[in-house]
Amino acid sequence: MAQTHSFNGRKRVRKFFGKIPEVAEMPNLIEVQKASYDQFLMVEEPSGGRPDEGLQAVFKSVFPIQDFSGASMLEFVRYEFDPPKFDVDECRQRDLTYSAPLKVTLRLIVFDIDEDTGAKSIKDIKEQDVYMGDMPLMTDNGTFIVNGTERVIVSQMHRSPGVFFDHDKGKTHSSGKLLFAARVIPYRGSWLDIEFDSKDIVYARIDRRRKLPATTLLMALGMDGEEILSTFYKTVTYTRDGDNWRIPYSAERFKGMKIISDLVDADTGEVVLEAGKKLTARAAKQLAEKGLKAIKATEDDLFGSYLAEDVVNYATGEIYLEAGDEIDEKVLKTLIDTGETEINVLDIDHVNIGAYIRNTLAVDKNESRQEALFDIYRVMRPGEPPTMDSAEAMFHSLFFDSERYDLSAVGRVKMNMRLDLDAEDTVRVLRKEDILAVVKMLVELRDGRGEIDDIDNLGNRRVRSVGELMENQYRVGLLRMERAIKERMSSIEIDTVMPQDLINAKPAAAAVREFFGSSQLSQFMDQTNPLSEITHKRRLSALGPGGLTRERAGFEVRDVHPTHYGRICPIETPEGPNIGLINSLATFARVNKYGFIESPYRKVVDGKVTNDVVYLSAMEEAKHSIAQANVELDEQGGFVDEFVICRHAGEVMMAPRENVDLMDVSPKQLVSVAAALIPFLENDDANRALMGSNMQRQAVPLVRAEAPFVGTGMEPIVARDSGAAIAARRGGIVDQVDATRIVIRATEELDPSKSGVDIYRLQKFQRSNQSTCINQRPLVRVGDRIHKGDIIADGPSTDLGDLALGRNVLVAFMPWNGYNYEDSILLSEKIVSDDVFTSIHIEEFEVAARDTKLGPEEITRDIPNVSEEALKNLDEAGIVYIGAEVHPGDILVGKITPKGESPMTPEEKLLRAIFGEKASDVRDTSMRMPPGTYGTVVEVRVFNRHGVEKDERAMAIEREEIERLAKDRDDEQAILDRNVYGRLADMIDGKVAAAGPKGFKKGTTITRELMTEYPRSQWWQFAVEDEKLQGELEALRSQYDDSKKLLEARFMDKVEKVQRGDEMPPGVMKMVKVFVAVKRKIQPGDKMAGRHGNKGVVSRILPVEDMPFLEDGTHADIVLNPLGVPSRMNVGQILETHLGWACAGMGKKIGELLDVYRKTANIEPLRQTLEHIYPDNDRNEPVRSYDDDAILMLANQVKRGVSIATPVFDGAVEADINAMLTDAGLATSGQSTLYDGRTGEPFDRQVTMGYIYMLKLHHLVDDKIHARSIGPYSLVTQQPLGGKAQFGGQRFGEMEVWALEAYGAAYTLQEMLTVKSDDVAGRTKVYEAIVRGDDTFEAGIPESFNVLVKEMRSLGLNVELDDTREAEQPALPDAAE
């Protein structure tokens, strides 16, 4: 029993307050990245060939390529990847890109073309593999290594392709009239806008160019005026009836009309409805039922109608009237004169059906398809004379050519849904029907039927993840390549070439490199802590190529939308100009194949909530009524209340329980990972929750990580999915453990083709992108049995597999002498001395020795004019030792650079005479520690160019590395031997031998004792009589030999890589990288924060004895200002304080029971208390089943404080907190009497005290504060530069000048503006004066004045400073005279 628990005891056990069971598994948090890129690359080819997506689709869309004459064709067959040349760690160390070579099989077909008939016949086919550049691979953690740094490709949110209907909200025209518009957005290709103007004419725009009447576009599609009208309007037939006319009666047309003149039945002549009455829908229907067929109409009723068809004299072909002409007396007379007895008019009543298309046709000057095409051509290519062919080709290529225009499957699906079409989703171009449907829909909207689209709805925005972004980029590269290939195919003798000769893969490789190196979406990974990594990978940006820009994005795009629920976090977004444009994916959300974000829901069947989970996108969700996860359910899963709060079509409402058909899976599905880590999130104001989730990402990993007492249950998930903590790949038994690696002998998922050993290399003191320290520590001991997925090593900011960003500290909420004014934080010295908030940061320094014009630079210990004292940390090669403590200005790597010949001073001549050449012609360009940094050297790496001789240090590093590799190989070999020989012994034990090693009698039974007499390598010589078994033995032998060969080959390959020279930038001969670890204790000026957006700066560190203390002498660690709570409305921190206090109280109780156990050896009270704290639930293994060792292990783990989990929106309530405080024997007020550490007197009233989880943020005073001594000056103004990086000064600005003026400090002011800033001559004189010990100096003219004079001269004003002072002043007239 102890064996099975030895490991479980080392997982953190939490008391769960959540009441809602978790039905759905949370998807892997970096699935977004990995799934997308895997789908793009498809490294392994499936058995039926690859489907048409990702890289395959790109190749399929560009190939086959034909030359201009059609005499040859280059076809794409398939692609495959070679294994990557370097693994992830090697790429990190050598500044390389982690990638795999892409090999593409191409087929060149050459045709014979018959000159007479033009028939083609195949003349020659050649197939060849062509190298097409390297494809970056994704690491297991969803990142890319580009030039040695880890980068993340952020997913982009953009407007989904498809058709959108919108209006201008009445802003365009002064009358406030709504102008409707439709826009067809393809995935790539020209946009088509169709819009109304203020006069209700319909216009079309292509690619936001000049507008054309929409009918021009329809004519270009091959329609004429009559066809256009018949498409958009029904017709009504007026039939001549004596002097009057009759029209067919339809209830649909007449309902809701107010009758102007009597309605007369055309057949009987009776009045069916008198003038002035309104015809209701019911009355209209009744009239039809009574048998009203037609009604009388007068000529006045005809006036103002429009003809539905041309009136033509068929004998002569003369057109009297055209379709669409308005009927007036003259037109009617013409109609009657031609003897027409039936007139078809358009069914337009200007109320339900407007005459927009007819009016557009009337203003359109184009009459035919040719004119329309020419008009479009002139708009798209102004200045070029159109011909019918070129106009037709251009129009076709705009919307109907799959090379140029692609709606994408998403666009087609969206378009079908919006317009009720049924085209296949393989039809990726526009069709005539689509354009007609769009115009029809737009006219319907204008007539007041239908709804406009909401572009901020997540059904209309989709996510482009890595794979898709990469696909687009690679397509661009291939298209650039295509042009070059076509030209080469035409210019070269095609019969003699191979595919290789036609292809230059540079453009494709360059496109990939450019994307990873410089795209706005390829970002330097935020690696401050595991949470910031995971959040960065789950980020959704609306910016970037093809997206929005900060300046143009309005309020609507940034705002929270009802469809964000369960898809995008409403809380986590940056403060500042990017607010709302950069979002985070919600915890349970995933992206579907069309790029829409889906959220999971439980199905409700017949009023019972089931455990079936469905994922729905925003569009699919709109038709459902969805209950919240915290709705009360009975035993059978039915709703308790008659009416249930639910969401339907973006509104929150109370619905009868029968109508509810879905339910949320978890309360935390609406927030992101970072927000789900904040306990009592529901009690915090949204603005502070936003700061809280953003600041957790800036928490620096501390030297001793400690998981929070008050967690939310998300901590282990983040630690596991981020890859910070190492999870076992398969079950097994721990064979070896040390600080740098864990060796596990696998017992589960054994695969003959793979090794039976898993070696996990731990990262020790590696530098992250943000210079924080990545260090992993093993959690297992030799002999532990572990299962797949168990956490076997902790990483940065993790504690027993839980995310641990900060520390639990004892907080008192009270003012203390003004030291916590304005959110300042007062700390106890104990926190500094116990290294509670100490972190390690690793700085990287790099120096390169180049080949210069004057000769090569050299890395050496032999540096001119440097004392032996300054070289004490360098080895003979001139590189600092590992472990050396270095200070500002210390030499890390000695380097000398040849300098040009200049005339020599006598001293130099003397030196040259004594020491020979060396002394004069080199200068010291060593790499030194920058000012203000102290630390310890933890690692040195030396890189040499191929063929450059290695120095002693490089050889030593190489030897170490090879020893490490050999140890790995030997361990793996030993475990392999143990496994294989164990199996061999089992197989032949007790069998009769048919043969054996030398001196062995045939026919003897083989026993284990007998085997021990021979060396293991001779056991293979035993043969048994059983043929089947003998076959198995031989198979085992060959498998063993293969494994051995593979191991050796792998080892030799790695050694060869270590010994080989490195790829270097041009001109670099040798490069040294030095890593210095800096220990940063917390100090005044450092920024700290809790998880609820309660941030502050450390103002003072007090001696422990001055801190307020409790009756039992416990001192507070930290004092916060209580005024920081009410106005900020983040009450969550107070609840956390109380609950943390209860946790610590419980822990103390368990500590006392442990002492009792040590004295009496009675474990029962301890067991009972732990069973009371951790009741049986489905989250943890029941404590009742623990054996004594496990109970003790758990007790030791929780004696500082019991860990609890209070999930967001489903956490502990006030009653739970009170119950815990009571259990711990504490006051339910959560307040205690505190005593002043300085006087020992109690404070006037009780103070809230408890444990809060505090973080130290990555805004450290050491990185910010700096002081300038002598440094660089700006070239033009001659003023000191600004900023710490430039070693700059502080700007003495306009307002500071006013301050000194107000004090009347004239001399100080003059000094500030001259000698301390940009009076070039003056500052030199001051320096000399100070050196002499003299304190008189004179200010001159500041350089900025000269700049002003020059500026004025550039404007044509010649200004000169007249500084010739009168030598003698004229004598004043004497008063006596």
UniProtKB/Swiss-Prot annotation:
Pfam families xrefs: RNA_pol_Rpb2_1 (PF04563), RNA_pol_Rpb2_2 (PF04561), RNA_pol_Rpb2_3 (PF04565), RNA_pol_Rpb2_45 (PF10385), RNA_pol_Rpb2_6 (PF00562), RNA_pol_Rpb2_7 (PF04560)
One record GO biological process: DNA-templated transcription
Reaction equation(s) it catalyzes: RNA(n) + a ribonucleoside 5'-triphosphate = RNA(n+1) + diphosphate
UniProt entry tagged with the keyword Transferase: yes
InterPro entries noted in UniProt: DNA-dir_RNA_pol_bsu_ext_1_sf, DNA-dir_RNA_pol_bsu_external_1, DNA-dir_RNA_pol_su2, DNA-dir_RNAP_su2_dom, DNA-dir_RNAP_su2_hyb_sf, RNA_pol_bsu_bac, RNA_pol_bsu_CS, RNA_pol_bsu_protrusion
Entry EC no(s): 2.7.7.6
A GO term, aspect molecular function: ribonucleoside binding
GO (cellular component) term, any one: DNA-directed RNA polymerase complex
Cleaved signal peptide residues: none
Keywords: DNA-directed RNA polymerase, Nucleotidyltransferase, Transcription, Transferase
Entry annotated with the keyword DNA damage: no
PANTHER family per UniProt: DNA-DIRECTED RNA POLYMERASE I SUBUNIT 2 (PTHR20856)
Quaternary organization: The RNAP catalytic core consists of 2 alpha, 1 beta, 1 beta' and 1 omega subunit. When a sigma factor is associated with the core the holoenzyme is formed, which can initiate transcription.
Stated family: Belongs to the RNA polymerase beta chain family.
Function comment: DNA-dependent RNA polymerase catalyzes the transcription of DNA into RNA using the four ribonucleoside triphosphates as substrates.
This protein's name: DNA-directed RNA polymerase subunit beta
Annotated organism of origin: Brucella canis (strain ATCC 23365 / NCTC 10854 / RM-666)
Gene name as annotated: rpoB
